[in-house]
């Protein structure tokens, strides 16, 4: 008999849940392809909350995957499909905004040990990374059975945080041979002052429009037609300006 995968789904919150997230959660719970247990943990601080969640998950002996969703993240309604990729650690593409810059949590570590955003504008589908966020994450049971103290910040000798619990968790898991994945076709929204998902989609659209325009210019240039067309465009602009 086919055994459904059992998912312990935790919606981390501080006493309230957004309406749009509640709608997605309701849709998720109607998916009968999986056995789903839902919890709403609200302990503080966040590292304590996550580690308590892990212990409760491990106590459920037949649970296969832990999924955690933060209350400011709106995943896609089909987010449970990530379980079927059978990866150690997998997330949708998540985004943060720092000083007005949109940053994808799709990170690879360079030779200097610095995390850089991968080329998410060019790539699609399932991609292996060195680090991702924990705002919406699916973790296989074997990972949490082996990673000790999974969620903890790292501080320097002066007590200043130098590594967040999300990146630290990824580092610990990778040291034990587990792999971290991000699926770029699943884009979660991150609600702050605005929808970061909408900003991301606008950026993707602009990127591909610019790329297509560049390719057209290259073809025209190779055919010796670019200068003539640009000259005609400038004439039209000047004509409109003089009206």
Residue positions per predicted region:
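Short beta-strand-to-loop acidic/aromatic patch adjacent to the donor-nucleotide binding site
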Residues: 63-74
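Anion (oxyanion) recognition and catalysis
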Residues: 30-32, 83, 174
């Amino acid at each position: 008999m086919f055994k459904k995968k059992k998912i312990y789904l935790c919606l981390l919150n501080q006493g309230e849940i957004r309406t749009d997230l509640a709608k997605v959660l309701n849709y998720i719970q109607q998916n009968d392809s999986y056995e789903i247990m839902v919890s709403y943990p609200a302990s503080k601080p966040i590292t304590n909350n996550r580690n308590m969640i892990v212990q409760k998950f491990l106590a459920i002996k037949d649970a296969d995957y832990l999924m955690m969703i933060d209350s400011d993240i709106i995943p896609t309604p089909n987010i449970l499909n990530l379980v079927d990729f059978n990866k150690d650690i997998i997330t949708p593409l998540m985004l943060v905004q720092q000083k007005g810059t949109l940053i994808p949590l799709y990170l690879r570590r360079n030779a200097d040990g610095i995390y850089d955003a991968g080329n998410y504008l060019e790539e699609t589908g399932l991609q292996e990374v060195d680090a991702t966020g924990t705002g919406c994450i699916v973790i296989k049971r074997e990972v949490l059975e082996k990673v000790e103290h999974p969620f903890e910040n790292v501080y320097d000798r002066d007590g200043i945080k130098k590594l967040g619990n999300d990146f630290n968790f990824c580092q610990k898991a990778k040291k034990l041979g587990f792999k971290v994945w991000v699926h770029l076709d699943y884009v979660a929204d991150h609600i702050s002052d605005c929808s970061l998902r909408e900003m991301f989609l606008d950026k993707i659209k602009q990127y591909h429009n610019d790329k297509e325009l560049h390719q057209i210019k290259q073809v025209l240039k190779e055919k010796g037609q670019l200068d003539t067309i640009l000259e005609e465009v400038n004439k039209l602009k000047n004509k409109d300006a003089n009206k």
